[in-house]
């Protein structure tokens, strides 16, 4: 479906049309990241378990995305600049350390049959669509177990997905999580994402400029391509229960 949009889409400028047809880039993304961790009994701050788990998950996502694009290439042909690309010569796979048997087979299939799309994965914020699907937004932690959020002029009550007596203790507030762990998790995912991720940084008024700079340096060291918003909040301001009702 995403590939078909390229041919059916309306392009406001000819340059966008030329580029889209040339590389056939799509932006296959994910949502419900924090929800997924909690469903697998992993707390965000449990760094080793967290990073190991998502490294495997996003490797699988990338593998099946490439495989699907390879199958499309057999049917419809490769994107026009495939020949001589990192996909064609195998550098894409070498750069990411994809050396297992299944990856070697896929690398050979891509070389032989091509790839329909030059770019595959990109993680969007999914702030609104996650509400519809009943999960957490994008790859961000939840802001609280229950809170009010403004969406297009309306106040929407939000409750952490799947909240119960067990998951209550697994969910962690975005503003109390060590942001350096979030950046390293972002780096673990980035290895498998050829484009970028919409990742927010959550800070409190107690943060110093040095701490904020260190978060950005951690992101850079982890290989993160880009960050989204820096969201600030004072932890001393408590939500009013009567106002919330």
Language-model regions, residue ranges each:
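Internal maturation/activation junctions in enzymes
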Residues: 1-17, 42-126, 215
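Core structural elements
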Residues: 1-5, 19-41
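Catalytic alpha/beta core of large soluble enzyme barrels
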Residues: 2-8, 92, 96, 109-116, ...
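Glycine- and acidic
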Residues: 11-21, 38, 42-55, 166-172, ...
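Flexible domain-boundary/linker segments
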Residues: 19, 50, 82, 86, ...
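Conserved active-site and cofactor/substrate-binding residues in soluble primary-metabolism enzymes
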Residues: 21-31, 52, 56, 60-67, ...
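Glycine-centered flexibility sites
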Residues: 27-34, 41, 77, 127, ...
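Residue-level recognition of conserved structural "scaffold" positions that shape functional pockets
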Residues: 34-36, 48, 134, 145
């Amino acid at each position: 479906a995403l590939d078909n949009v390229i041919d059916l889409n309306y392009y406001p400028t000819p340059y966008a049309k030329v580029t889209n047809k040339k590389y056939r880039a799509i932006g296959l993304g994910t949502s419900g990241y924090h929800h997924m961790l909690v469903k697998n009994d992993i707390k965000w701050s449990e760094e080793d378990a967290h990073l190991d788990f998502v490294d495997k998950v996003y490797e699988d996502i990338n593998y099946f995305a490439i495989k699907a694009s390879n199958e499309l290439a057999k049917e419809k042909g490769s994107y026009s600049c495939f020949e001589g690309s990192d996909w064609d010569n195998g550098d894409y796979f070498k750069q990411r350390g994809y050396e297992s048997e299944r990856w070697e087979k896929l690398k050979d299939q891509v070389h032989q049959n091509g790839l329909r799309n030059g770019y595959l994965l990109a993680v969007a914020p999914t702030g609104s669509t996650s509400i519809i699907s009943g999960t957490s937004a994008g790859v961000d932690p939840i802001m609280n177990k229950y809170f009010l959020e403004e969406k297009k002029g309306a106040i929407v009550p939000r409750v952490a997905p799947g909240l119960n007596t067990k998951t209550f203790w697994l969910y962690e507030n975005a503003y109390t999580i060590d942001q350096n762990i979030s950046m390293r998790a972002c780096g673990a995912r980035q290895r498998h994402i050829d484009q970028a991720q919409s990742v927010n940084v959550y800070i409190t008024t107690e943060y110093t400029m040095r701490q904020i700079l260190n978060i950005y340096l951690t992101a850079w060291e982890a290989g993160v391509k880009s960050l989204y918003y820096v969201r600030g909040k004072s932890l001393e301001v408590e939500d009013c229960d009567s106002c919330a009702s």
